[in-house]
Amino acid sequence: MSDFYQDFNKRRTFAIISHPDAGKTTVTEKLLLFGGAIQLAGTVKGRKADRHATSDWMEMEKERGISITTSVMQFIHNQHVINLLDTPGHEDFSEDTYRTLTAVDSALMVIDVAKGVEERTVKLMEVCRLRDTPIMTFINKLDREGREPIDLLDEVESVLGIQCAPITWPVGMGKRFKGIYHRYQDIIYLYQQGSNAKKVEAMQIKGLDNPQLDELIGDSADELREEIELVKGASHGFNLEDYLAGKMTPVYFGSAINNFGIKELLDDFVEYAPGPQPRATQERVVSPNEETFSGFVFKIQANMDPKHRDRIAFLRVCSGAYKKGMKLSHLRIGKEVQISNALTFMAGDRSHTELALAGDIIGLHNHGTIRIGDTFTQGEQLKFTGIPNFAPELFRLVRLRDPLKSKALLKGLIELSEEGATQVFRPLNSNQLILGAVGILQFDVVAHRLKHEYKVDCIYESVNVTCARWVYSEDDKAMSEFRTKAYDYLALDGGDMLMYLAPTKVNLTMAEERYPKIKFCATREH
């Protein structure tokens, strides 16, 4: 095994964030292509094409061409182990994305050159801000006409409140796109429309004043020289400390679909991006160089392999090393478990791993005992913090077409809710099942997966619930009285936590006023 593979400092764990359709999944594919993880990149738009993007592997994603769940992929580049977490671009899956951002050390933001900063990017950036996550930026689709690069940098700075340091700079765009200039290497990489699926080495010209540049790109050479002078005066120089503190984003330009500008980004990413960072627990801060193992579960995915009807818990290793066959304490349930078959991932492909270090993501087989937010250690009582659970904003009543399938329905809903993509509520006063979600597409996903993976066909009806809140109280007497008086509005969620289901916002406000000793919470930590 290579030396670098056994060094946690050589780990780079990051997520890609963007607005839908900025080209995030294509960028993911091309990073894997240049990282040597795949030989041929699939393309995302060819919905019916034979070759699908490696990271979009769930049936429904293949049909719709959108990334719904977070994929985890590991590959090696320049003697570093890179763990790439692809997040759903679709806004209905924000919870999955928020939780994924708790498991990474840095992020890559993808922006469409024609559209600039979009709403979803703003929201994701806010989440990164909470943790001061270092962010690199890739401005994509330079092979099409778009906005002026300098205007885009201004927009990123003003809307997202982060300084931009352009590392590469485009030579033209659209039909006039000739390549990119790397400001710190003083090299021009000439654009050639790469075969979409294979990597091609770009032709390089050393030096902005090289006469060869004028021969090859004509008038564009002088335009580039003028622009670079302007950029020097109008933009920030790259400062590594500011980037690592989340105050500055290095910016790269390119065309992911044509494999252009990605390699330069990847080379710099490996050099600049942070390795595994310390993590907060309720008890203390855990450092990645500690010898004993610790980690937390940030995602659960059911049926990654329909042939095996299994569930996998994705665990971020925070310290120490996982070694095959080791015993770990599953702290929430107070049990020691032996783990001999942890997995690593290349999107839908998985293989058993012998070793995982801080920064790595491993998959644990889950037979219903592991939940999002669970901590695993070698015995020390720790609870990692900051893994959010959001109260849903949309609700549906679920009815079975075949009443004999009620057992399968409950099993399916509980398993799907354990993934955190949807929530299931059982009202105390009836046998009904109510589904809650943050976005409308989640209901489609649940319906599709219940039908195909659990063979349960349901009818989904509107229900008289507008908002839900977790309810707690430190005063047992007040809680007991509240349970009696508000009985008709109470339900249990998939984890048996008590929730208040309010038919209207006014009803919720009145309940909060009437029961001052009860806390009504829109989020809770896992």
Curated annotation (Swiss-Prot):
Q: Could you say which residues bind GTP here?
A: 18-25, 86-90, 140-143
A single GO molecular-function term is: translation release factor activity, codon specific
Q: Which Pfam families match?
A: EF-G_D2, GTP_EFTU, RF3_C
Signal peptide extent: none
GTP-binding among keywords: yes
* Subcellular compartments: Cytoplasm
What is the role of this chain?
Answer: Increases the formation of ribosomal termination complexes and stimulates activities of RF-1 and RF-2. It binds guanine nucleotides and has strong preference for UGA stop codons. It may interact directly with the ribosome. The stimulation of RF-1 and RF-2 is significantly reduced by GTP and GDP, but not by GMP.
Tell me the protein's name: Peptide chain release factor 3
Q: Which organism is it from?
A: Legionella pneumophila (strain Corby)
Lineage, top ranks: Bacteria, Pseudomonadati, Pseudomonadota, Gammaproteobacteria, Legionellales
